[in-house]
Each structure stands twice: as C-alpha cells, then as structure tokens.
Amino acid sequence: MKYIMTAAALALGAGSAVQAADDVTLQLKWVTQAQFAGYYVAQDKGFYEEEDLNVTILPGGPDIAPTQVIAGGGADVTVEWMPAALAAREKGLPLVNIAQPFKSSGMMLTCWKDTGISEPADLANRTLGVWFFGNEFPFMSWMSQLGISTEGKSENGVEVLKQGFNVDPLLQRQADCISTMTYNEYWQVIDAGVSEDELITFKYEDQGVATLEDGLYVLEDNLEDPEFVDKMQRFVRASMKGWKYAEENPDEAAEIVLDNDASGAQTETHQQRMMREIAKLTSGSDGALDPADYQRTVDTLLTGGSSPVITKEPEGAWTHVITDAALK
C-alpha cells in the first residue's frame, strides 16, 4: 500500500507540485478494538486520503485520559463518552461534541439468574459491581429513580462494589451483578464458560438512563478557525463513511482492526463478535448528534444522586456546524 501511494505521489509530482494533505490526530478512548473500527476502516480504505487528510490514530488505554491528551495539544479530536466530556467542560476544559457516531448505549448490568433477580426491583439488598471514573453516574441515576439507596445492603439499598475493567467479581461470586458492555465484557463472561441461560441483563438503554457514549470532541476555541472547521468536516465525512462500511462488512472491518492492533492482544473471534455488536449501536446514526439524546444524557447526569457528574445545564457543549456541512 505504501509503495502504491509513493508511486502515485511521484507521478503527480512529475507534472505539478503536490499539496501536502492536512494532518489530523485522533485520540481513541480505549485500546485498538472494533469499538473504533470506523476510523481504522476509513484509513485503510483511503476515505481520509480522498478528503486530503493524513490521519494519525492514537490508541488509548488504562493510563491514557483522552481529555488530558486533547487539553495538552496531543490530539485535534478525541473519542469520548459524553459524561466525561461534560464533566471536563464544567471543570474548565471547553470540549464540544462535533459528531455522534454511536446512537445507542452498550452499557448494561449483567446478573446471575440463580440469585432470583428477574426485574430491576429485585436488585435491592444485592452487591452490584459498578465502574467508576464517571461511568457510575447512569447507574446512580437509575438507582435513584428506583428509590434504591447505594449506601449499603438493605431492603431498599444495594452494596456498590467498585469494579475494575474485568468480570472477575461476577465469576467469583463477589457480586450478584456487574457492569458490562454489550460488545465486550458480557462476552468475556460467556467465554469463561458461563451459559447465556444462566444470566439476566438490564440494558441502560431500556431503563431510560442511557448516556451517550462514543462521540467526537474538539476544543471550542478551534471551532473559530475556518481551516480547522473545514478539516473536521472532511474528517467526519470520511469517518462516517468508514463506519457505514464497517456496519455492512463486519468481518472485513474486524480484520482491519486486527491489522492495526500493535499489541497483538485481540483475537479474530472476539473482534468479529464485537464488530457485530458495535454495528447495532452505530446503525441508527448518520453522525449528527440528536438533541433529544443529548438532553436525556444531561437529565440523567443531573439526577445522579448526591454527587452528580455535572451540577448545572451545560451551554455550548455541542454543535451541528460540522455535521451540517459534512453530511449534506
């Protein structure tokens, strides 16, 4: 591929001066996996190149905070979940959502069925594994709506276990339920030898407390630069082309992700399965943020119990300026 691109560049250079492509650096929220397939597909298929962009994709990880990377100038645009982005904005980092490739949330609570849990009301007096670092707020809002305290086990309370990013608390019966994503941790439980019939799941989307997940965020000041805006319009257009290709060609998309996994930690089976689940979350979006989804996210965060992730209605936290031009 590199040879072909070099040859093409030489051919162009023979007749006229070649204008350099515009550089864009994208910071991912997590490690290289099918959760970010659309961007890798856009790069692999030449969609970014067609938009005259030279895109560098930076994987995330447990020691990488996307908001800190973009704040420090290490990226032009970052993939982040809206709760973290809005929290950062309230604390002084002016992040703005410019596109929302994920329409639906993949977060859910996965429980052992033999505990007798069959509906949300049954969660009282149980131990529940919950992710923190901003991921706990949809859960706290849900418990608040159910009238269930999170201060400890009781007839109307639950014990909250701070869960790491693994499924051990469920497998080891330290918790009756744990936090999982439809495309990742749930399948780790299944791969550990648990039957789907042994489990019951509660999707946050179904409970009305889902918050928006993978969106594209930039710093507000950059949106005052017409050249940056133009660059982001081209980036979003190419990225959404990549996402739609990935939805329609999940196995090929998974292979492209694996080709970009420098760690070698991912497997074909897991990535193909993940891509199929991710496609369910992106299929309802053309890239433009739905204001109703944004408002639901804000309302959920503002009712997240005694210590909400945001304390007031945000202002200027999203824009359609990029998608209006990119998707027309």
Model segments located where?
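Sec/Tat signal peptide C-region and signal peptidase I cleavage site
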Residues: 15-21
